[in-house]
Amino acid sequence: LVLLFQFQSGWELLKGLKNITIDGGGSTLLMDGEMTSFIIDSCRNITLKNFHLDFVAPTQTEIEIIEQGKNHLLAKVHPTSHYKIENEKLIWQGNGWSFSEGIAQTYDRKEDVTWRSWCPLDGLKSTVELQPGLLWMNYQEKPDTPPGMVFQMRDAIRDEVCGLIQYSRDIRLENIRIYYAGNFGIVSQYSENLAFEQLYFEPEPGSGRTNTGFADFLQVSGCKGKVQIQNCRFTGAHDDPINVHSTNLQVVE
């Protein structure tokens, strides 16, 4: 079963509830646009389990370099990376979002290694679509990227999270496969006793994608009690897989 959601904010809002279990039964929840997939707010004893999360057009776009020339790159676009070309300018886009400059990492499939990198949108003079999904990219100077490398590109703005848990206690997420997390991962704040079991942040096997999210996958901020993270797998982050910290704010007049 695949469910498609095409609106902003959260598809699943749990607020002020207790003793609830939502079992997805292996369903895939497919997001279209920049969305927060779920919110657990002021709840107690909530379990979410047994479903997959993915996006129609992930906000991190991917190209694989086929050829490097004196002043050009020949690039193959991943099918889930949507774009348009206006006056020879390359613009990445999805439902309600777009960018034409940003941040990038490169990924080496053979070595399974990722580096911070220059962005192939930088210094780009013009782009020509040779055929759908195949781009000829002209540069002011010789681009320093060999064939076979994959660019993972994104905007610098983190304006949506995959999931939000706040002001809640005794929350459990179990057996959830997150093929793409969006502009941030699952953020837990001001909550108590959290359990994350068998969460798999990784591109869907066979999809050809190499990244899973903008930033931290699990961020726990200002929480208390016991936080359990067991039997999880994290692949393709542009920041920390797990980040646990306090939240300290200075009050000024």
Locations of the language-model features?
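A general structural signal for short secondary-structure junctions and capping/turn motifs
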Residues: 39, 127, 187, 232-234
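Extracellular beta-strand-rich solenoid/capping regions of secreted or surface-exposed proteins
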Residues: 3-21, 30-49, 54-73, 157-168, ...
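Acidic/polar low-complexity surface segments
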Residues: 3-14, 56-159, 198-220, 239-253
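Beta-strand/loop edge motif enriched in small/polar residues
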Residues: 155-165, 173-181, 196, 213-238
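Residues in short coils/turns that link rungs of repeat/solenoid architectures in beta-rich domains
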Residues: 29-31, 55, 180, 203, ...
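All-beta strand scaffolds that present successive hydrophobic residues in beta-strands
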Residues: 21-24, 45-50, 170-175, 193-199, ...
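Short, solvent-exposed linear motifs at loop/edge-of-secondary-structure regions
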Residues: 13-26, 226, 231-250
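Conserved, compact domain cores that house catalytic/ligand-binding motifs in diverse enzymes
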Residues: 161, 165-207, 243
